[in-house]
Regions:
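Long, compositionally biased non-active-site segments enriched in small/hydrophobic residues and glycine
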Residues: 1-228
Length: 228
């Protein structure tokens, strides 16, 4: 799966599944034994600190430090090769137990996003209305320009991404493009509540007008607010 992978985290990528499963367990096998002494949740907090985590891993693989490599909870003194091999094995077991045959998994099968609404935290509201939108398969990850990061405690559920994507032409502000994760309206019954979701998920954009004349000439409807 990794040998033939082009490094692109597309929805149909099998290599992306293998890479991220191995990466999660690699980080766990290197750091978790030491971090557990700081209390529950310490490893999750460390994993969320992307820059620190990435720099630490680079330092280890560049040979600048081996302080974290050995598992302090075992008698054996592990080498980096031991940790890497264990991470491959752990990743395979994790994927097989949770999803079935790892060789058949595609990134979009496991890496998914639900645009959650706070009101859905109430089980009754969720059952009656369900303000949330999703789930949907999502390409990319925290390691790509198309940001879609997941929590290590719940791989591979997307927990964060871009709140808006926008392209600005500074020579012509009316020649811009933008897209939102769900829609322009926060009103649940509005046709614009979730009408941008599929485009956002596919990495597409909508024209973004800036000047009054451009907006007025391309409008499809008009909403007027009147005070009383």
């Amino acid at each position: 799966m990794l040998k033939d992978w082009d490094g692109v985290e597309s929805l149909d990528s099998k290599g992306a599944v293998a890479f991220h499963a191995i990466y999660i367990h690699l980080v766990q096998n290197i750091f978790q034994d030491e971090l557990q002494s700081f209390g529950d949740g310490s490893f999750d907090t460390f994993y969320s600190l992307k820059y620190i985590r990435t720099q630490a891993i680079r330092s280890i693989f560049d040979g600048k430090t081996n302080l974290w490599v050995d598992n302090v909870k075992t008698v054996k003194k592990e080498t980096l090769n031991d940790i890497v091999n264990k991470s491959f094995e752990d990743a395979f077991i994790f994927l097989k137990v949770k999803y079935g045959n790892p060789s058949e998994l595609k990134w979009g099968d496991v890496h998914q996003v639900t645009y959650e609404h706070n009101l859905d935290a109430d089980p009754l509201v969720q059952r009656l209305i369900n303000f949330s939108v999703g789930p949907f398969p999502m390409a990319g990850s925290e390691m790509t320009p198309r940001a879609a990061s997941y929590s290590v405690s719940k791989p591979f559920d997307v927990r964060a991404g871009s709140s808006m994507r926008r392209i600005i032409d500074f020579s012509d502000f009316d020649n811009g493009y933008s897209i939102l994760p769900t829609g322009q309206s926060g009103l649940f019954r509005s046709k614009h509540y979730r009408d941008q979701t599929e485009m956002y998920n596919r990495g597409e954009f909508k024209p973004f007008m800036f000047t009054y004349d451009a907006i007025n000439s391309s409008k499809s409807s008009k909403l007027v607010f009147k005070s009383k």
